[in-house]
UniProtKB/Swiss-Prot annotation:
Homology family: Belongs to the RimP family.
Residues covered by region (Disordered): 171-207
Keywords: Cytoplasm, Ribosome biogenesis
GO biological process: ribosomal small subunit assembly; translation
HAMAP family: RimP
Pfam family, one: DUF150_C
SUPFAM superfamilies reported for this sequence: YhbC-like, C-terminal domain, YhbC-like, N-terminal domain
Task performed by this protein: Required for maturation of 30S ribosomal subunits.
PANTHER family per the UniProt record, alphabetical: RIBOSOME MATURATION FACTOR RIMP
Organism placement in taxonomy: Bacteria, Pseudomonadati, Pseudomonadota, Alphaproteobacteria, Acetobacterales
Database matches in InterPro entries: Ribosome_maturation_RimP, RimP_C, RimP_C_sf, RimP_N, RimP_N_sf
GO cellular component, one term: cytosol
The protein's name: Ribosome maturation factor RimP
Length: 207
């Protein structure tokens, strides 16, 4: 499995395979695809920048137009559908192997489908990912390896350390403070960059 792609199956994986190259050409990365509903489903696309900075509402608009156009052409979904595009946010989901490595040292929560040593839910410090497993150091100091292919959900926990790290990622290139200068960059609130109106594509007509 490509460490740059989220772990998905079925129709979600099919849509991801179509969308990911489009985002890459625009300088973005696919974080998550979720298709909700059966009749007139909503296709939720979560993305971030390839350089690690969070996307803005304007980015969501651009992604929505580009992704909507290619989905119209490839037509993976029968009937009418609605497209929603949002930023991954600060306390983002961990859907790719690279996420576990990129955010190593930060607190996260994860839940697997099949119990490991009698439990499905885990909370601890990210230690990275290797060979299809994400590693956590739990509160008692023990380490656990969770199969990414069996991950039900995993996401970062909002902490002061994560907010500070996100503030650095949100800077534009060349925007870092000079040595000795106070960093006054504020982290975006949860869901920043989400575009419920501009990033929402009207349902297309049924063929």
């Amino acid at each position: 499995m490509d460490a740059d792609l989220p772990y998905l199956t079925g129709l979600d994986a099919k849509v991801a395979a179509i969308v990911a190259p489009v985002l890459a050409d625009m300088g973005f990365e696919l974080v998550r695809v979720a298709i909700l509903g059966r009749e007139s489903p909503t296709v939720q696309i979560m993305a971030d920048r390839a350089d690690g900075t969070l996307i803005a509402i304007e980015d969501c608009e651009q992604i929505s137009h580009a992704v909507g156009a290619v989905l119209d052409v490839e037509d993976p979904l029968p009937g009418a559908w609605t497209l929603e595009v949002s930023s991954a946010g600060i306390d983002r989901p961990l859907t790719r192997a690279k996420d576990w490595t990129r955010f190593a040292g930060h607190l996260a929560k994860a839940e697997v489908n099949i119990p490991i040593d009698g439990r499905k839910r885990f909370s601890g410090i990210l230690l990275g990912a290797e060979d299809g497993f994400g590693r956590l150091r739990l509160e008692d100091g023990t380490e656990v390896a969770l199969p990414l292919s069996d991950m039900r959900r995993a996401r970062l926990v909002l902490t002061d350390e994560l907010i500070a790290a996100s503030a650095h990622m949100m800077r534009a290139p060349g925007g870092a403070p000079e040595e000795g200068e106070e960093d006054t960059t504020e982290a975006a609130p949860e869901g920043a960059g989400k575009s419920p109106k501009p990033g929402r594509r009207p349902a297309r007509k049924t063929h």
